[in-house]
Every structure is written in C-alpha cells, then in structure tokens.
UniProtKB/Swiss-Prot annotation:
It is an enzyme of class 6 (ligase). It comes from Roseobacter denitrificans (strain ATCC 33942 / OCh 114). InterPro entries: PRibForGlyAmidine_synth_PurL, PurL_linker, PurM-like_C_dom, PurM-like_C_sf, PurM-like_N, PurM-like_N_sf. Pfam families: AIRS (PF00586), AIRS_C (PF02769), FGAR-AT_linker (PF18072). Monomer. Part of the FGAM synthase complex composed of 1 PurL, 1 PurQ and 2 PurS subunits. This is Phosphoribosylformylglycinamidine synthase subunit PurL. Part of the phosphoribosylformylglycinamidine synthase complex involved in the purines biosynthetic pathway. Catalyzes the ATP-dependent conversion of formylglycinamide ribonucleotide (FGAR) and glutamine to yield formylglycinamidine ribonucleotide (FGAM) and glutamate. The FGAM synthase complex is composed of three subunits. PurQ produces an ammonia molecule by converting glutamine to glutamate. PurL transfers the ammonia molecule to FGAR to form FGAM in an ATP-dependent manner. The active site is at H47, H93 (proton acceptor). The gene is purL. GO terms for molecular function: ATP binding; magnesium ion binding; phosphoribosylformylglycinamidine synthase activity. Mg(2+) 1 binds at E91, N526. Substrate binds at S92, H93, N94, H95, R114, Q238, E310, S311, Q312, S528. Mg(2+) 2 binds at D115, D266.
Length: 719
C-alpha cells in the first residue's frame, strides 16, 4: 500500500503545528515517513507529552516518607505498613466518552485498572467522577445512560467494587462530558514492577488481546477541541472486553511470580508506540520492533495502524530470555497472545520493521525527551464581584430545591448499577462520605474519595484548588482515616487561551499549597486539556482522588445516628453564600467569591476528628449545601429526623470550609466540647437528631416526604 505524501494538511490533521513539524525535520534530517509522522504525532500530542502543563506539574509536591513511587510510572505507590503498598491513579477518558459513551467510559475503566495491575497490584477499589451538561440538554440523557452503563459493565464484569465517586450537571459540560476513572490496588511493597527496560538483546514481548484498527489516533483526538466533525471521530474510540482484561490481569500477576519480567508497561494512549518508547527511554536503550510478529485481528493492517492502534487489553514486556517457556505457558493457560515482537538494542534508535521494510528509524531518546514544552501565556482570574443581597428562603423549601436537583439528589440510580460488594471486603458502599475497603486478611482498611467543586475553581482557581484537596482530606478524616496521598485529574479547556491557562496555573498553586499543608503528596495523575466545543470551555475541574489508611477496623467512624443524638458542628460558621449550591439552585445565580480555605484549620480539625473518634457516632464534612444538606443526608441515611436551631439561609446553607457535622450522645458531646476547648477549636451544638421530621427553626416537613424527593428525583429527571 502506497503511503500518503507528507503535506501541510496531513501534518495539521495529526495535530502538529508548522513549528513542531520543522522541529521533526531537524531531528530526523529528512522528510519523515507516514509512520514516523504518526509516531511523532502520538508522542508529542498534549495527551501524552503534557507539553502545555509540564512546567506547572513540576511544582506539585510529590514526595514523602510514605511515597514509594511518585509520578512518572503507570500509577503511584504508597506504603501502608506491614510490607504492603497501595497503588492508585486517576485518569480521564473525556473525549472518547462524549463521542461513544458506553465504550468511552468502559475503556476508561479498563485503562486505569491496567495501570494498577501493571505495577504488580491486584485492584481492590474503583471510583469515578462524572460531569455532564444540564439535564434538559438533548444529549445529556444519552450520555448519562451510556457512561454509567459503560462504567458498570466493565467494572462489574472485571470484578472490582466501585466504592465512591461524584456526578454533577452544569450547562458548561453540554459540549464535553468528563469521565474521570480511579482505581487502587494492593501489592507487596518490595514487589513493585516498573517500566524501565534493562539489558541489551532482551526480548520485547507482546501480551494480551490482538491488535485491531480501533482507537487509531485516539490520543491525538483527545488533544483537540470538538467541532461539527465530531461524529467522524467515532472510529478513534477504543472497544473494550472486560473478560479479556480479567484474564490479562490474572496472567500478568501470575507471570510476575515467575521472575520472568524485567519491565512491563500497559498499552494505553498511543498503544505500541508510547509503551515501547517509554520502556526504552527509561532504560536508556533502543528498541526494535518487527510488526509482522504482532498478533492482529484484522487483515492488511499497516505499520502506521499497528503503531497507533489503541486496542485494549494489551501489554508490552521485556522478558528474561531463559524463562520464555515458563512465561509463554502462563499466557497459553489464560488463552492470551504471547508473542516476541522485538528486542532491546544498544543503539539509541526506535526501529520499526514491517515485512522486511523499515517503516520508522528514529532517535528514541530524542523522540521521548524533546517533545515541545510550552510556557503558555496566562492571566490570573480576576477577583469575583462581591455577592449581592441574598433574600432568605424558607429553610425546607431551600432543602427541597437542593434534594430535587440532580446535583444533590441521591445517586442511588447510578450506584445501584455498579457492583459495590464484589471481593467481599467493602466496609462502606457509595452514598455518603468516603468509601472503605478492608485490606484482605488484615484488620486494616483503606478509604477512598474523589472531590472537586468546579464553580469554586471558576470563581477563584487558587481557593478552588485548595478546596478540592481540603474536601478530600475532610472526607477521609470523617471516616477515621489518616490521609496518605492524592492523585489529580486536571480537566480544563484550551490552554492556548491565557484565561484558561490562568485557571490551570491558579488551580495548581492551590493544590500545591493544600497537599503540602495536609501531607497528601500527589503521586500520580493526568491532564486533560482542550475540553471545549466550538470555543466554549468546561468549568475548570481539577478532580482530586485521595486515599487514607485506617490502621484498625475498630477505628472506622460509622454512620450510627440514633434518636436523641446531639448535632455538633466543628469549625466556625460565617454564612458564606458566594458560589453556594443554594445560590445556584434557588436563585439561579453564580456570584461572589469561593469560600476561603484555612489550611491550618483544616489540619487541626482533621487531627481532632481522628484523635476523638471514640466519642463520635457519625461524622460528615460540610460542603455543598452546607449544614442543612449535610444534616438531612445524615438523618435520612439513618431513618431518623433532625431538628436544627437555625432558620436563616446563611447559617443553614452557607458553605464555609473546614467544618464537620458530628452526631453523638449527650455525654460524648460534653467530652468533645471539653476536648475542643482545650485544643482552641470551635465546636457548637446546633440541634439534635430525633423524631420523624426535618425541622429547621420553625419550618418542618415529614422525613418520609423529603426522603421520597431525595431518592426519586435523579431517576425521574432521566426518565
């Protein structure tokens, strides 16, 4: 097959600028082949190279005594004691999920699971953070149904519990939904597998499913805005098979026990290209690939297609040659392909041969290490206009407005489509607060949460970035966990626009300050830019996934609210209504500044919760919807009413940060009051849990009536 001529239009269609193509000419010293152009396009796109964000990502705190492996590998690795480690990462699959919701979301789950077990860890938990357009938008229902089905379909069949996540709706996501997938696994701390190749002449082995044409150019597609040609991009979306992935995981983990693995890398974005280049680059070696040896499922595939295919459930390994037969036997047992497709070489070359013809011959280190790195112009987000007058709303009417909104109604409709109990180690299922999974065979547990409030980031990127981390810290603390580390998923619009780049820079500054103050280093992550359609960007959405350790299951703070329990608020209440949920849902206003985050107070309050958990029967952080929504959710979950003394909108629905709602009996409340006073912290009695009504001041409604609204509104909105 004759390859197309390299023209300006072809270069542009590969997402390369004229300046970038000139750089390629200088590197190669000649006109690149079509396959070489595709390889550069894959390695230099935003999705793989982080060329617009790398400068700022370097400023994130990524180290700590608990960190075994930080950013740069497939996933982060954190020590949890007793010779064990938790391996985790969050990653986006936004563009594919908008084009093909089911497969886009499903393969997002599959990709993040591979990142975890490639490191030698068995996945034990998954989460997802989903953002959609307004519920009335003609595409939203299709996207929600497809994405949720894809997440559940893949995760359920693979056999990993989904223990948490978020679902939000805003018109800013009408043209670009966000699908951020998180996975965590367990491994022996001294048996982590890395991707750096080692040794000259070592076999490079292809593992897993066969290669097809699905996903060709997927990484490049994910590095551009959408326009009216979106439907033409459907073939760039990968197709997943969770049962093959399950077999691949079992085979990979079994293979790792044989000692045959020198290095291993999953094939994700840019497929065979990116995995081979990364392995060679990290090991300071070259790589030769013979593509006629690659297992394929379609006829007459070209070198270009094989190098850029993003077919799922595939891995690349550098093998100890003396253990080839033992390794092959493992993959034969699991009915998966095992093919030696190349070797490591001493020369700094990335050599691609197909049917005896050299299709690409490039300097590997240069290909990996000289992707453009841009210092994009940016402007700081201007200070938000002051919040105008907010008239008081009847408290129960305000609550009803929140719990009937798809943003704050129960997400049972979503979570019941996920298997939350598979593996039988789930301690707390999704619905309220952080998810908890027992470390199998031990008395320890891990807690997981995913958090961000995009409207805060839009108004004030620095405070919004801080708040995303702080809320994750609070969610972990509220269940009794000690926060360990975080993973970030940075979802933004077009970085070539200074105002968008300013949002990114501000959020990074806020996140950096928060993870440093709260001792939650960033150990892995992902950047998704160009989330725009026809020039309209999403809300800036820097999602934070966080993991905490519960040393003993007895230390878990439960949800044991009972009639007669006292309601306490830890932290100061000032009635901050700027950018609040009540302002948006009742008044349709997005005004004022985001609430400020006092990181010293956040740390002190989290430490106080953990130190005094023996006195606490139930605990939740106060975030969206303030005290009113938190108290209702806690009461509704327990099936008992709640009476709060306050009746004014600011006290009930304000979103001051750093606060927790605590339920306990009277004696425990007294002990907590004394402890808080001694620590110099503010702890206030705000009411009690009792009866079967929700009463805020003089306004009340039956709990059962409000519970029906809360439980049924989400599904009804999608009907």
């Amino acid at each position: 097959m004759q390859e197309p001529a390299i023209t300006p239009d072809l270069i542009a269609s590969h997402g390369l600028s004229p300046d970038e193509y000139d750089r390629i000419l200088n590197i190669v010293g000649r006109t690149p082949t079509f396959t070489e152009l595709g390889i550069f396009s894959a390695m230099w796109n935003e999705h793989c190279s982080y060329k617009s964000s790398k400068k700022w990502l370097r400023t994130l705190p990524t180290t700590g005594p608990q960190v075994i492996c930080g950013p740069g590998e497939n996933a982060g690795v954190v020590d949890i004691g007793d010779g064990q480690a938790v391996v985790f990462k969050m990653e986006s699959h936004n563009h594919p999920s908008y084009i093909e919701p089911y497969q886009g979301a499903a393969t997002g789950v599959g990709g993040i699971l591979r990142d975890v077990f490639t490191m030698g860890a068995r996945p034990i938990a998954a989460m997802n953070s989903l953002s959609f357009g307004e519920i009335s938008h003609p595409k939203t229902r299709q996207l929600v149904n497809g994405v949720v089905a894809g997440v559940g379909g893949y995760g359920n069949c693979f056999g990993v519990p989904t223990v948490g996540g978020e679902v939000r709706f805003d018109p800013a996501y009408n043209g670009n939904c966000l699908v951020n997938a998180f996975a965590a696994g367990l491994a022996d701390a001294d048996k982590i597998f890395y991707s750096a190749a080692s040794g000259v002449g070592m076999p490079v082995v292809y593992l897993g499913a066969k290669t097809g044409r699905d996903g060709v150019g997927g990484a490049t597609m994910a590095s551009a805005e959408f326009d009216d040609t979106i439907e033409e991009k459907r073939p760039t979306v990968q197709v997943g098979d969770p049962f093959t992935e399950k077999r691949l995981m079992e085979a990979t983990l079994e293979l790792m026990q044989t000692g045959a693995v020198i290095s291993i890398q999953d094939m994700g974005a840019a497929g065979l290209t990116c995995s081979a280049v990364e392995m060679g680059d990290k090991g300071n070696l070259g790589v030769r690939l013979d593509l006629e040896k690659v297992p394929v499922r379609e006829e007459a595939m070209t070198a270009y297609e094989m190098m850029l295919s993003e077919s799922q459930e595939r891995m690349l390994m550098v093998l100890r040659p003396e253990l080839e037969q033992e390794a092959k036997a493992v993959f034969d047992k699991w009915d998966l392909d095992f093919a030696i497709v190349g070797e490591t070489i001493a020369e700094d070359r990335f050599l691609i041969v197909h049917n005896g013809e050299v299709k690409a011959d490039l300097p590997l280190k240069t290909l990996a290490g000289t992707a453009p790195e841009y210092d994009r112009p940016w402007v700081a987000t201007p200070a938000a206009d002051p919040l105008g007058d907010v008239p008081d709303v009847d408290p129960i009417d305000g609550l009803r407005a929140l719990i009937s909104s798809p943003n704050y109604a129960s997400k049972d409709w979503v979570f019941t489509q996920y298997d939350t109990m598979v593996m039988a180690d789930t301690v707390r299922i999704p619905g309220i607060g952080a998810g908890i999974v027992r470390v199998h065979g031990t008395d320890k547990a891990l807690a997981f949460t995913s958090d961000v409030t995009p409207r805060y980031v839009q108004a004030n990127p620095v405070e919004g970035g801080k708040q995303a981390v702080a809320e994750a810290y609070r969610n972990l603390s509220a269940v009794g966990a000690t926060p360990l580390a975080t993973t970030d998923n940075m979802n933004f619009g077009n970085p070539e626009k200074p105002e968008i780049m300013g949002q990114f820079v501000g959020a990074i500054k806020g996140i950096s300050a928060a993870v440093a103050a709260l001792d939650m280093p960033i150990v892995s992550g992902n950047v998704s830019l160009y989330n725009e359609t026809d020039g309209t960007a999403i809300l800036p959405t820097p999602t934070i996934g966080a993991v905490g350790l519960i040393a003993h299951l007895d230390d878990v703070i439960g949800c044991d609210v009972r009639d007669g329990h006292v309601a306490l608020v830890l932290g100061e209440t000032h009635g901050h209504l700027g950018q609040s949920a009540i302002l948006s849902e009742v008044y349709n206003r997005a005004e004022g500044d985001a609430p400020p985050v006092d990181l010293d107070q956040e740390k002190a309050h989290g430490d106080f919760i953990r130190a005094n958990r023996a006195y606490i029967k139930a605990c939740t952080d106060l975030s969206d919807g303030g005290l009113a929504l938190a108290a209702f959710e806690m009461a509704e979950n327990a099936g008992v009413g709640v009476c709060l003394d306050a009746s004014d909108t600011a006290t009930l629905f304000g979103e001051d940060q750093g606060r927790y709602l605590i339920a306990c009996n009277f004696d425990q409340a007294e002990a907590l009051m004394i402890a808080a006073s001694q620590a110099g912290l503010t702890l206030t009695s705000v009411g009690k849990f009792t009866g079967q009504a929700v009463r805020f001041g003089a306004s009340s409604a039956p709990l059962a009536e409000l519970s029906d609204v809360y439980r049924q509104s989400f599904g009804a909105a999608l009907a």
